[in-house]
């Protein structure tokens, strides 16, 4: 398969090709050290908005690769869900499903970069209270769909704030609270996920969905979508845990502020704050276990709760994997 962008190698050359006339790449002509050179020296792309998808061709086999995390200055957890292997030996397509934190601080100057992703629909999973004053800032050609998935999320957080400040919640209790929250998301998220999958099924254009931090509701939404595509649970968990990596600087800043505030509020639970701001394999497993215990497993949940028939699921898999 030699279409789009791809790398071609023979005994003497290692060439990166592109179908974009605005992008200029280097050609490496080394033999034994070629892999080292390619990995340590990024190809020069003149068009900074262009996101290349690269077909790596070796011995007749092709693997499509791309950068998972997509950098925007104030949107820290924006990433592509593609590139994951399924239990059927397929791969989730790059550039079809995107997840992120809220887009209220997406800059107008970054609209070209956003539009380069060809996203036509954005699903906002936040509650109206969360959105107020933090509305998504989107290019005018992008459709916005408000699909709140957890109706009481704002009340949950506001109710916890005073307890955290006064040290009324232990670290273990905060983990239990998050686990219960994830169990609740499973049921509350069904209408939003149904709408999201219907759009994916009927449109060839990429979609994006997000909540506030892009980790909990967005994480479960991603886990369910990948389950529909028959990605195994450990791979789903690994993808979910990436939120801690991409949000690490933001979380570190918040924890630094919390440690300073602890001087005034000595009972403030810094560990509790960290548990609320982080992802945890235990949280997502609570959601999986809830589905297994209450709905007869993931396949039954997909069919009976999400309303996706075997034929529809096959169609979704064909559309979103290769």
Feature locations, PLM:
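Cys-dependent protein tyrosine phosphatase-like superfamily
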Residues: 1-207, 221-322
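Hydrophobic anchor at the beta1->P-loop junction of P-loop NTPases
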Residues: 209-211
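Ser/Thr-glycine-rich phosphate-binding loops at phosphate-binding pockets of nucleotides
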Residues: 213, 217-218
